[in-house]
């Protein structure tokens, strides 16, 4: 009985919009990326302003977490308060439960 009510609660929750962004170079992206991620190099991150709501949950990753940290700062300074640095591609994969897609 408890499980039935738990499922009702879970399925009644509003869906959360989530965007995963790979901020590495084009060559790094082509070597593999997280399933469901979009690619935009960190220095071009503000191009998102017309495409993604400032309320959306955004996770950014790169090779080590450095560039994604810079991109996260740019976004938070621009009002994207739900932007989060997910670290390296491996860390982000674990955090978000996403596989790396290799081309």
Per-range role (PLM):
Residues 1-8:
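Sec-dependent signal peptide recognition
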């Amino acid at each position: 009985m408890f499980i039935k009510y738990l499922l009702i609660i879970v399925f009644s929750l509003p869906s959360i919009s989530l965007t995963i962004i790979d901020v590495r170079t084009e060559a790094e992206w082509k070597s593999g990326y997280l399933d469901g991620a979009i690619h935009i190099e960190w220095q071009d991150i503000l191009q998102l302003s017309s495409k993604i709501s400032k309320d959306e949950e955004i996770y950014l990753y790169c090779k080590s977490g450095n560039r994604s940290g810079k991109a996260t700062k740019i976004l938070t300074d621009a009002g994207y308060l739900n932007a989060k640095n997910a670290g390296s591609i491996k860390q982000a994969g674990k955090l978000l439960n996403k596989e790396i897609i290799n081309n």
